[in-house]
Design a protein with these regions (language model features):
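Extended amphipathic, helix-rich lipid-handling scaffolds
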Residues: 1-58, 63-189, 193, 212-260, ...
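Outer-membrane beta-barrel pore domains and translocons
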Residues: 45-47, 156, 199-201, 273, ...
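Outer-membrane beta-barrel and related beta-rich outer-membrane complex signature
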Residues: 56, 280-291
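C-terminal structural cap/anchor segments
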Residues: 254-261, 265-277
């Protein structure tokens, strides 16, 4: 295989993007055509000692595959899809090691079978960040006329350790467990449909994920959508891990029609509210008030002019927190759910001492870029104050 890859390199592939590969491939193809049948069948054997993509930081070692195939070019859709008993050709797939910046697998093996216009893989289990990832029986179908690929499978993930994920930033430390249960996954050129749900046990509460779907999964313009339910998140545990400022209390909420395209959020409807719980205080630090005000208006609440005594108060009490936010057509809105006396509140104080955060521009809409700028400024107010004081 390596000599063939060298031709690609010499043909002008960008330096550093070339595949480095060593191994062998062989195959057999049988073609049968008569008045009743047009069939292409055969078998491909692949043995790769090592494949390396420096640009993607991907390394693959010890790949061995024996893949049979049968393409019945005259089989009509109405003839139906063959059952497992109609898959006469057996094969195998094994992988010694796969390593990427995000994942690493060792010792993967799977049996497969082929029938007319169909492949089927036996169930497969992988260890992933302390959890167990299971794929059920996977079937792939090929349309002989248009060449479209469809398929179905199932997937289950138990007890994945979020602390082990390679997505941690220097500002956020994510701990907890995750699990997914997708009893039915349907794949087509236009849509990846997923039935089931997932959950993340984080920050003393639960984040539930449901209604997953991927539109145009093979396109760069693919759209990923899901719904999210936020159940009893401990705000103290959450704000201990993000540079927002301390907030205490219990939070519930939902995110509907959360949609991503080209790696960025495209639309959502978010609503979160505090839930009183006996023995759990409800407080906002001054830094948290500043950062919430930055998100809602673009300006700090204290602006460096707050009385000196306020800087020594650990937390200001609040009676209720309620926020609604939407993203549509590159436009953000941010509003409070609490409206009293013609005033819209993001945070409402108790009857006596406490803190209010008022939305003074409830009808204002801002661009996605401006909201990203505000989010990037969150947590910087305290740093800026310290540098000025020094």
């Amino acid at each position: 295989v390596a000599p063939l890859l060298s031709l690609y390199s010499q043909a002008g592939a960008e330096k550093g993007s070339e595949l480095k590969i060593s191994g062998k491939v062989s195959g057999r193809v049988d073609i049968s055509v008569d008045a009743d049948e047009a069939r292409v069948s055969g078998r491909t054997a692949l043995s790769l000692e090592r494949l390396e993509n420096p640009a993607a930081k991907l390394t693959l070692e010890g790949l061995a595959a024996d893949i049979p195939f049968i393409l019945d070019l005259r089989r009509k859709e109405g003839a139906g899809k063959p059952e497992s008993s109609d898959l006469p050709e057996k094969g195998r797939f094994s992988l010694g090691r796969l390593k990427t910046p995000l994942l690493a697998f060792d010792g993967v093996e799977a049996a497969l079978a082929a029938g007319p216009n169909r492949f089927e893989f036996e169930p497969l289990t992988l260890r992933l960040f302390g959890g167990r990832l299971e794929f059920g029986r996977t079937a792939l179908f090929i349309d002989p006329e248009g060449g479209a690929l469809t398929g179905r499978t199932s997937m289950r993930l138990d007890e994945l350790d979020l602390a082990g994920l390679p997505f941690a930033s220097g500002q956020v430390r994510l701990t907890g467990k995750a699990k997914l249960d997708f009893p039915e996954i349907e794949l087509s050129r236009e849509r990846l449909g997923i039935r089931g749900q997932g959950e993340l046990r984080v920050f003393g509460g639960l984040i539930q994920l449901s209604n997953f779907a991927v539109e145009k999964p093979f396109s760069e313009s693919r759209r990923i959508s899901l719904d999210v339910d936020i159940v009893d998140i401990d705000l103290k545990k959450l704000t201990d891990e993000v540079p927002f400022g301390e907030v205490t209390g219990i939070l519930r909420g939902e995110v509907r029609e959360l949609t991503f395209s080209y790696g960025q959020p495209e639309r959502f409807f978010l609503k979160v509210e505090s839930v009183p719980r006996k023995g759990v205080p409800q407080t906002f630090s001054l830094k948290a008030v500043d950062n919430l005000t930055i998100l809602s208006s673009g300006e700090r609440a204290s602006a460096g002019t707050s009385p000196l005594w306020m800087r020594f108060v650990r937390g200001f009490q609040y009676r209720k927190l309620g926020i609604v936010s939407t993203l549509r057509n590159d436009t953000f809105t941010l509003n409070g759910t609490i409206k009293e006396g013609g005033v819209e509140y993001l945070v409402k104080k108790p009857l006596f001492f406490g803190i209010n955060v008022i939305n003074r521009m409830p009808d204002k809409k801002i661009s996605f870029r401006e909201m990203m700028d505000r989010i990037n400024r969150v947590g910087q107010s305290e740093t800026g104050s310290k540098s000025k004081g020094g």
